[in-house]
Amino acid sequence: MVILITGATHTGKTFLTQRLLEKYNYPYLSVDHLKMGLIRSGNTCLTPLDDEELTLYLWPILREMIKTVIENHQNLIVEGCYIPFDWRQSFEVEYQKDIRFICITMSENYIENHYSEIIKNASIIESRLDDNDCSVEFLQRENRFYREGFCGYGENVSLIDGDYEVWLNEVLTGESFL
């Protein structure tokens, strides 16, 4: 089984991934690690700021890795921002049966009311080098972008709008991953 975890920045994708790793013992692939490896090795001229181009560049690689994992009856969590809204179109139905998907977004009110907590927890799993451009407005815009994009393709989007720990426990105890 493959679990795809995507969503806006600062929504807790990596934290959720870590908790799923602990619960299911599934290995995980951080798309950010793959991205930075390709950039730092000189295998692409793209930069970390080239979000749209990175999605186009990384998705064919990720897609084929996901297919290989499924064909080998293995498990993997794939976590990161670079999953296209129309990702399902890349897989035949037989593959889709072995893929679970979650897109995490936060409501505008949640961001406004919990901004300091969001920033405080930004590096809970991985270190962020620079969060200076991460304003309330930026986070609201990013979350709206992901919510509208994935909903536009009929995907369910998990909305954090209340207590984060309650949301996290609901996701972890839900049936959506098995």
Predicted segment positions?
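Hydrophobic anchor at the beta1->P-loop junction of P-loop NTPases
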Residues: 5
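The conserved Walker
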Residues: 9
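Conserved Walker
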Residues: 15
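Glycine-rich phosphate-binding loop used to anchor ATP phosphates in small-molecule kinases
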Residues: 54-98, 102-106
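NTP-dependent small-molecule kinase module
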Residues: 144-178
